[in-house]
Structures are given as structure tokens and as C-alpha cells.
Amino acid sequence: MTKNGLIQKSIKVLFLRGSGVVLLFLFTMFLTNYYSAELVGKYDFVRSTIMILSGVSLIGTNQAIIYYSGFLKSKNSLESIKNIYVKMLMMTTALCLLFILGYAMLPEEFINELFNKQEAHSLILKSIAALFFYTTTMLNIDTLRALNKTISSELYRNIFRYTPIFIFSIILYYTQNQEWLIEAFLASFLLLSLTTLIQVGLLFKKLNLPKNNDYNFSYHQIFARSYPMALSAIAYFIMQSVDIIILTAYEGFESIAYYSVAVKLATVTALALMSVNIVIAPKIAEIYSTNDFDKLNKLINDSAKIIFIISVPVLIILFVSSGFMLGLFGANYVLAKEALLLLLGG
């Protein structure tokens, strides 16, 4: 991949990511201005819970399939990826079932006392019940990327991921059924898991049938490759969401709503990093498999320059206009200004 090609593709992905951020903030602004802060806080608690749980249930398969894609492309055997995907889907499904069984053994009183909230047990239960659909959606999104459908992958990750719940939330508001917000959020992933599963299945049908010399990886080999990636993913989700989980035990859901908006604004600074990574990850795996480390170093250096050039202006704008930005979500959300500045400084 040339530097110009990297820049052009990164800009396309960045545009989709930027559009996704705009959509996310429009949705968040709608919630914070038309739903109670308590309900928004419950929604953010459920969203954070399912993100952390999915880091475990995915066990790195969504990242590992990118590696296998690059490896198989370098061996001219991409059609072998179908069997890998099916095994990954079986692995993640088994883990989701284990979560359900494990949580069923925990006393309701214990969970409620742990989080100091009467609704904590039911909110987590709903998250676990929808975990399979959320996990499958995330795996399918990266499978699309592994199958050279980067734009489709980013459309799901950044646009379609928020569109159903945005529409549902508007319907719930105008029908005076706001209390169903969390159920609508979780149900949106049932819809997304089905649509992505259909698209992935259609793409697999277009691949050539496996040949006798194609690569076949066992469950153990896939797990050995994916679990180190799971550790980094879990660490990322914990860093992104554990503060909201911990805050739940000490503050009301209203405070969680205020703080969560600050977190969303702070994550905008990582937009360039994520956009470039989306583009270069399959290429890194492909180049690494050929042992062309000079080419690999050049790709990484070019990527780092692009990330720096895009990130710094965004960081400065957020620092200068933090109060104004928070005010868009409602008057009370300005209370999170200090938290936002601390997050940006970190």
C-alpha cells in the first residue's frame, strides 16, 4: 500500500468514522434533552456492561480474523477463512451461554448490594441476555473487513450500529414509552446480528470452494492466536467503561449520565488512531507474513504521521470549547466540564 493509497483510504474511513461520531452525538443529544438523566444513566450503564462482557465473549476473535485474513491472502488461500469464522462463532456462542449460566447462579441481592442499586441485577441480566447478539455483530463487522469490505464494515460500525436505536428512541419518545429505551437498545443488536450474518454468508458464497491444500486451523490453534488479542481488547474496554461501572456503586444514575457525555467527547481524540488502524491492520498482517520488515516499518511510520496531524487540532478544539460542547447536551451536563478536561489531559 503506497502512502497516497493509505491516505486516501484512511480519509474515507475517517469520513465514515466522523459521520458515525456525528450520528452518535446527535443521538446522545436527543437522549439528554428529551429523556431523564436517570434513564440516560441506566442506558450508559448497560452499554458499558455489555461492552466489557463482549471483550471476554469475543476472546479476540474479531481481531484474530483480521490476522488470518492477511495470512491467507499472502498464501492465496482466502477461501479457508470460512471454516475459521464458523469455529470462532461456535466459540463465542459457547462463552455467551457460560455467562448466562454463571450469572444465573449469583443471588440478586448480592448484585444489587454490590452496585448499591435495586435495578443493578435486572440491568446486568438484560445485558447478558443480549450478549450473544452484540458479540455476533462485532465479530461480523470485523469479518466484513477481513473479506475486503472495509467500507461496509465501517458503515455497520459507525452508522448502522446507532441508526436502529436512534429511530427506536424517537418512536418511544413520541409514544410516551421512554421506559423501554434499554430494551430497544439491546433489541437493535438482534437486528444488526441478523443483517450482518446474512451479508457475511453471502460473501462466503462468492468465495471459491476450499481446495485440498487449503489451510485448516483447529479450535486450539484459533484460541491460541486470539486470546492474546482478547487481553488487549479487554484492557481497552475496561479502560473505556470500567469507570462508569465503578461510578454506579457510589453515585446516582444521573451522575453517570453527565460523566458518560464527557467520556464520549474525550474519545473523539482517538478518531484518527482508530481510522488509520482500521485501514492498516489487514495490511500489517499480510506484510508480516512475508517478513518484509522494511516495508512494515515504513507503513507504521507513515500511519503515525497521519494520526498526529489529525489528532492535535481535535484535541485543541475540545480543550477550548469544552463548556460549550457540554452545554449542547443540556444545562446540567456542564457539571462534567472538569471531568472532560481531566480526560483530555490524560
Where are these regions (language model features)?
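Interhelical loop/hinge segments that connect adjacent transmembrane helices in multipass membrane
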Residues: M1-L6, E113, Y174, Q178-F185, ...
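Signature of the first transmembrane helix
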Residues: G5-I66, I100, A104, Y227-F253
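Membrane-interface junctions at transmembrane-helix termini in multi-pass inner-membrane proteins
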Residues: I7, F133-Y156, L341-G345
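Membrane-water interface segments that mark the loop-to-transmembrane alpha-helix transition
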Residues: Q8-V21, V46, I59-E108, S122, ...
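Helix-loop junctions and terminal segments of transmembrane helices
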Residues: T28, I59-S74, A146, A262, ...
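Transmembrane helix-bundle signature of multi-pass secondary active exporters and lipid flippases
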Residues: Y43, R47-L58, S232, Y236, ...
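Interfacial segments at transmembrane-helix termini and the short loops linking adjacent helices
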Residues: P107-S127, F253, D294, N301, ...
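Hydrophobic alpha-helical transmembrane segments
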Residues: H121, L125, L155-K205
